Amino acid sequence: MSSTKLSTSILPDLVEIQRASFCWFLEEGLAEEIKSFSPITDYTGNLELHFFGDQFKLKCPKYNLLESKRRDATYSVQVYVPARLINRDTGIIKEQEVFIGDLPLMTDRGTFIINGAERVIVNQIVRSPGIYYKSETDRQGRRTYSGSLISNRGAWVKFETDRNDLVWVRIDKTRKIPAHVFLKAMGLSDSDIYNGLRHPEYLKKSFRVEGNYTTEEALIQMYTKLRPGEPATVNGGQQILYSRFFDPKRYDLGKVGRYKINKKLALSIPENIKVLTPQDTLSAIDYLINLKFNIGETDDIDHLGNRRVRSVGELLQNQVRVGLNRLERIIRERMTICDSESLAPNTLVNPKPIIAAIREFFGSSQLSQFMDQTNPLAELTHKRRISALGPGGLNRDRAGFAVRDIHPSHYGRICPIETPEGPNAGLIGVLATHARINSYGFIETPFYQVINGKVVSDGNPVYLTADQEDNFRIAPGDIAIDENNAINNDIVPVRYRQEFTITKPEQIDYIQVSPIQVISIATSLIPFLEHDDANRALMGSNMQRQAVPLLYPESPLIGTGIEAQAARDSGMVVVSYQDGRVTYVSANKICITDDEGKEVVYYLQKYQRSNQDTCINQRPSVWLGEKVVAGQVIADGAATEGGELALGQNILIAYLPWEGYNYEDAFLISERLVYNDVYTSVHIEKYEIEARQTKLGSEEITRELPNIGEYSLRKLDDNGIIVIGSWVEVGDILVGKVTPKGESDQPPEGKLLRAIFGEKARDVRDTSLRVPNGGRGRVLDVRIFTREKGDELPTGANIVIRVYVAQTRKIQVGDKMAGRHGNKGIISRILPRQDMPYLPDGTPVDLVLNPLGVPSRMNVGQIFECLLGLAAENLDKRFKIIPFDEMNGAEASRVLVNEKLMEARTLTEKDWIFDLRHPGKTQLFDGRTGEAFDNPVTVGISYMLKLVHLVDDKIHARSTGPYSLVTQQPLGGKAQHGGQRLGEMEVWALEAFGASYTLQELLTVKSDDMQGRNETLNAIVKGKPIPRPGTPESFKVLMRELQSLGLDIGAYKIENLPDGQTRGIEVDLMSNLHNRRVPSRPTYESITREDLENSFA
């Protein structure tokens, strides 16, 4: 037996981190914040406004979830707080419920709906408030120590020793103050100081050098140091000390800071005292001095015991505090300005500051992110993400290697594999599978206790934080355990004090609950993970999140056992709340009646568009009359099958070079994958158009479009809007719209007609919504929003129309595919089935990969998966292989694969499945010639994903298009309909070949020589020779920039003189600046009769 038998049963709810934090905010955080700033008094002390934070009320949301998404609204509740205004002069008390703002509500899936889009608040990992000590050694080898006291809010205090053995205090990086002066200013006597130190003689040196002070002198001395140039008084010193350290509104250690300081300095100050006390300061200085005598230890800033996670609830609480502080100022001003008789709580409280603070947080904070909804795994991982960036966090440009690196304390808490590639590597992580966050914000992970070499696994596991764990010897989760729960080996590898060592089973304190405890959900979905290089496992984890949900999902033949929980917790599947029997089932809803006859209706999501334009569609997986139990999956969602995650397809693959078509990781696929819709996915695009009020009149949605034939309007209804169900091609009209034409838009003949016929002939311009490139498909839905219906529209818009077009995308050349082991590639060719290599039984292979992609990348897990998949297909079984299976014996993976292949060979009587001469390889035949390949080939069934990087979204072409205003060069990128940039490397290539004329026209008339490009177009239209290029606009910009720096720069033309000498004549490149036309579109000069006759001659 192995410890993994118990592992999956205690996997926590994977989205609990989001939900629990938001619940805490509603139950405690919000009330705590409102109470903290009550009462508010005016400057005279006459008026007092009290808030009863714990009695706040939430009103029902204006729209439900679906309606909020449909209307682009925010799914939020209104917050009302009872308030009492007391007038001390008159004794009048007024009580009212006041509205303090809208609070977005979390959905049951842990997301928020802001302006109709689902968003996620990412958890932030920051330095925990507390005290941290570090040592530094100077060039002479002398060691100095310093301790930083970090608060949640307020001044930072630094205690430091110097080379002369003096102790100093620094407040907020200002000038140094002698430590004893600071202690005296805080009200401690000499005897208090000496009694509180283990080595008082060390501080006596500071007394001798800096002099002894009374409390009053110390306050004056401190004031002088902190506010030099101002007259120092005792009162001023007390004031500055109070405002910096003893005022709860300005200085706050927080619950966590108090806990950490008490723990580090062995104090027992109550948790509700969140300001600095003299005892804290004295103990901090005592600890600093003790370090000089090698007592105590310095801190590691990257240890997870010193970093804490701020989840949604706390981040929201901070925003509410910001809003309340702004509100407090407004209330004070109103109390002063307004007549005290007419004042009431309602008139004093303006909800705008709080609404603005919350809206700003959800709309533009770095931690509020547009949810990645590509597939259920992407959604789940996004909610479990931990970021070190954001307000109060790190800056990616200044973060060094130490912060990004894997720390031993991450073990079982933050996944060492799953992190982005690129500038954010190491700054953004994901919670490990079993990790949870405790009330202080520290990450905990579970362990079973080990007593005398026996694992106690029948009770609940013990959750430990990183600093608690350091004191125990902890065994990994993949060591062998016998049936009596005793550890088998004589010597066991353990972790102790952040080191990996070995020890005897009797000395072990705890054991991990599961081998996958160390890694994240996405990483734990990779079978045979232990045989893959970490870099490739990272790519595999990240690419599973980019897999597109397919039309016909198929769960993997080789899984790890986590698939079902990942699908369930992502919220994509529908789960039954109660035991009962299915009384009605259709594509849209399922009804389940329990034993007491109570019916519950479950509505399914049909063809909804996700944030990434993929399709969310739920399908019932139960039959009429079927008995279901609570917690059973009754409907599958996108990318799930049978309640399990199904991101890709099991297909037959071969590792074999084929005519160079799988060079550099390219894939060669069979047309079966296209014709049988194996990798077909549905994508839903949203197109929007608004009719606005312009200066020349309002735009109109209409079918009457100028110069458009009836054929182009055949799919529109009477109002000029596309009919639902129509098939549309690129360039088709979705919504007809006309805009009044301005005077400047009129051609000369138009102006003449207007002069003759007056206003009536005033023209309109066709500005209809058309299907863009790559947008062909079926119209799924049309939504019309108007003010009359009560919809909120953008300013200036009279009507907004949204058209949803669904398209099926078959797999094609240029699409990106990948396996779960980081083996990614682009499809280079689609071969007919008959040309694909085939197996001895005639089955053609579906996909051909390059065998050179395996050895150098060291992701051998794909080979194990591929061969076990072949066995699984032939045995008609599915395997769940938990990673790190070496506890079952040496080379367990290899033994298992060989065993199962042999079993499959015996069962099917196909000898080629397992050839003893070359195990794991099979004789393969060339589909074109029917001849066998020279060498046997590795063939098997692997789980391959189609990724969201589809060629349809990337392919792009441009003939003419928009230009940048400043440089007059074509814009870049598909979104701007840009051109292909000819960069400096491309210029070098043309220079190397000496293609001077090609290079010249690329840098001038094809780019930013404005006059030249217009003249060239004219010449091409008239069939004349192309004129010589002029000066590029970007050269003129460069000259202007250099001139703006005060450099006298000019362009000179070289002229040959009659005597054979040359001279330079300055040319004014800007001479035609004022009379040039704005080149928004190419200009044609009209062709004269003479030109026409010449061209026909």
From Swiss-Prot:
Annotated compartments: Plastid, Chloroplast
GO biological process, one term: DNA-templated transcription
Domain of life: Eukaryota
Any one Gene Ontology cellular component term annotated for this protein: mitochondrion
Family annotation (CDD domains): RNA_pol_B_RPB2 (cd00653)
Entry GO MF terms: DNA binding; DNA-directed RNA polymerase activity; ribonucleoside binding
Entry keyword annotation includes Plastid: yes
Primary location group: plastid
Keywords for the protein's UniProt record, in alphabetical order: Chloroplast, DNA-directed RNA polymerase, Nucleotidyltransferase, Plastid, Transcription, Transferase
Keyword match Plastid: yes
Catalytic activity: RNA(n) + a ribonucleoside 5'-triphosphate = RNA(n+1) + diphosphate
Enzyme Commission code: 2.7.7.6
Family: Belongs to the RNA polymerase beta chain family.
NCBIfam families on file: PRK00405.1, rpoB
Function: DNA-dependent RNA polymerase catalyzes the transcription of DNA into RNA using the four ribonucleoside triphosphates as substrates.
Subunit structure: In plastids the minimal PEP RNA polymerase catalytic core is composed of four subunits: alpha, beta, beta', and beta''. When a (nuclear-encoded) sigma factor is associated with the core the holoenzyme is formed, which can initiate transcription.
Name of the protein in question: DNA-directed RNA polymerase subunit beta
Organism: Rhodomonas salina (Cryptomonas salina)
